[in-house]
Amino acid sequence: MTIAIGQNQERGLFDLVDDWLKRDRFVFVGWSGILLFPTAYLAAGGWFTGTTFVTSWYTHGLASSYLEGCNFLTAAVSTPANSMGHSLLLLWGPEAQGDFTRWCQIGGLWAFIALHGAFGLIGFCLRQFEIARLVGIRPYNAIAFSGPIAVFVSVFLLYPLGQASWFFAPSFGVAAIFRFLLFLQGFHNWTLNPFHMMGVAGILGGALLCAIHGATVENTLFEDGDAANTFRAFTPTQSEETYSMVTANRFWSQIFGVAFSNKRWLHFFMLFVPVAGLWTSSIGIVGLALNLRAYDFVSQELRAAEDPEFETFYTKNILLNEGIRSWMAAQDQPHENFVFPEEVLPRGNAL
């Protein structure tokens, strides 16, 4: 008889922590959860706190909290004052010096939410990578989620970094985001930017593809149930497919003359279109951060200036942009003491 004598391998601290993090529980934690849960919790908590109690009087001269009479659509956590520049506005930093009230007044909550929100989104993306690896599937969900991360980082961080201060980023609120959109249009003519056009095409195209795909699958289910919905006929363990790709292909071939014949290509296309839209719009925002111009049809502007009877939709929009700038610059940045001479104020029959 042979007796094998061996030592149990000692499990280090890393192995113990790894086992605990990956334990099967109702809400999976994982290594990504160390980044995701604290940052997401703090970002959400900061936003609820700011919209409930914190004023924007000292940064924008506005009321922005429920305490001041705002509602869900008008409440916001506003960006720091322009004088703060690109400071991280740490609570213990030279601006607030540990004073929480002063920190809120100068816009510290916005920097807090923006930075923790960015890390929270990155943590959620890493969570999808981690779970995909543990389950044994490919990480396309995480790759797709890179689109929202790119948009958040470009709009809330990179754009104001290219401008004078965090002041020019969007505030965290519904009406505040709308104001930021008007700002982008007035100061950058954003709607005529080709990267914005590609972004719109990607997002709306993705919504259209989603609707078409869902309707087509519902139309070609192999077996319909006798209940009020179609889920009764589906079982998670069935070996056959739920709907007929062949029938769907024939249907769209008759309508368009061409149709997807391969499920992999079809679903990759549905992944690619909206993600490409998000990424291209993010690239466009980085261009705006650097004050790059897109389409300026100067010849039309010159002709419209010389000929009062010549006007295009482009020249009308340029006049609208001038109006936005003349109002928003003085209204939003009173500390700059902007004074606009009469010749730059909106004019012409477009307004």
From Swiss-Prot:
User: Could you name the Gene Ontology cellular component terms for this entry?
Assistant: chloroplast thylakoid membrane; photosystem II
Tell me the PROSITE patterns matching this sequence: REACTION_CENTER
The EC number(s) attached to this protein equal: 1.10.3.9
TM region(s), chain numbering: 39-59, 123-139, 151-164, 206-226, 277-293
Leader sequence segment = none
Example GO molecular function term? iron ion binding
Q: Where in the cell is it found?
A: Plastid, Chloroplast thylakoid membrane
Residues at which pheophytin a binds: 128, 141
Q: State the InterPro entries in the record.
A: D1/D2, Photo_II_D1/D2_sf, Photo_RC_L/M, Photo_RC_L/M_CS, PSII_PsbD/D2
Q: Which residues bind chlorophyll a ChlzD2?
A: 116
Instruction: Kindly list the cysteine pairs connected by disulfide bridges.
Output: none
The UniProt keyword set, sorted, is: Chlorophyll, Chloroplast, Chromophore, Electron transport, Iron, Magnesium, Membrane, Metal-binding, Oxidoreductase, Photosynthesis, Photosystem II, Plastid, Thylakoid, Transmembrane, Transmembrane helix, Transport
Q: Which residues bind Fe cation?
A: 213, 267
Q: How does it sit in the membrane?
A: Multi-pass membrane protein
Can you tell me which residues bind a plastoquinone? 213, 260
GO biological process entries: photosynthetic electron transport in photosystem II
Which reaction equation describes what this protein catalyses? 2 a plastoquinone + 4 hnu + 2 H2O = 2 a plastoquinol + O2
Where does the chain bind chlorophyll a PD2? 196
- Pfam families, from UniProt? Photo_RC
Q: Which Gene3D superfamilies match?
A: Photosystem II protein D1-like (1.20.85.10)
Additional remark text = 2 of the reaction center chlorophylls (ChlD1 and ChlD2) are entirely coordinated by water.
Tell me, what does this protein do in biology? Photosystem II (PSII) is a light-driven water:plastoquinone oxidoreductase that uses light energy to abstract electrons from H(2)O, generating O(2) and a proton gradient subsequently used for ATP formation. It consists of a core antenna complex that captures photons, and an electron transfer chain that converts photonic excitation into a charge separation. The D1/D2 (PsbA/PsbD) reaction center heterodimer binds P680, the primary electron donor of PSII as well as several subsequent electron acceptors. D2 is needed for assembly of a stable PSII complex.
Subunit composition and interactions: PSII is composed of 1 copy each of membrane proteins PsbA, PsbB, PsbC, PsbD, PsbE, PsbF, PsbH, PsbI, PsbJ, PsbK, PsbL, PsbM, PsbT, PsbX, PsbY, PsbZ, Psb30/Ycf12, at least 3 peripheral proteins of the oxygen-evolving complex and a large number of cofactors. It forms dimeric complexes.
The record's family statement is: Belongs to the reaction center PufL/M/PsbA/D family.
Protein's recorded name: Photosystem II D2 protein
Task: Identify the species of origin.
Answer: Thalassiosira pseudonana (Marine diatom)
Q: Source organism lineage?
A: Eukaryota, Sar, Stramenopiles, Ochrophyta, Bacillariophyta
- Its gene is psbD
